């Protein structure tokens, strides 16, 4: 309405679409295992038995 367009009530459809798109963008980067804080003193590829 401020720029000559028709007035309309805000609605959740736009918000839902934006939230769904954001969740889809982040999905490939979510961790597959729980985060475990650690200090790396040894660098290399270790087997589970070596760890």
UniProtKB/Swiss-Prot annotation:
| Top-level taxon in the UniProt lineage | Eukaryota
What's a single GO MF annotation on this record? cyclic-nucleotide phosphodiesterase activity
Report keywords, A-Z: Hydrolase
* Alphabetical list of SUPFAM superfamilies matching this protein: LigT-like (SSF55144)
Q: Name the top EC class.
A: hydrolase
Residues annotated as binding substrate? 13, 40, 43
Record-annotated active site: 11, 38
Q: What is its EC number?
A: 3.1.4.-
Describe its function.
Answer: Hydrolyzes ADP-ribose 1'',2''-cyclic phosphate (Appr>1) that is produced during tRNA splicing into ADP-ribose 1''-phosphate (Appr-1''p).
Family classification = Belongs to the 2H phosphoesterase superfamily. CPD1 family.
Q: What is the name attached to this protein's record? A: Cyclic phosphodiesterase
Q: Which organism is it from?
A: Triticum aestivum (Wheat)
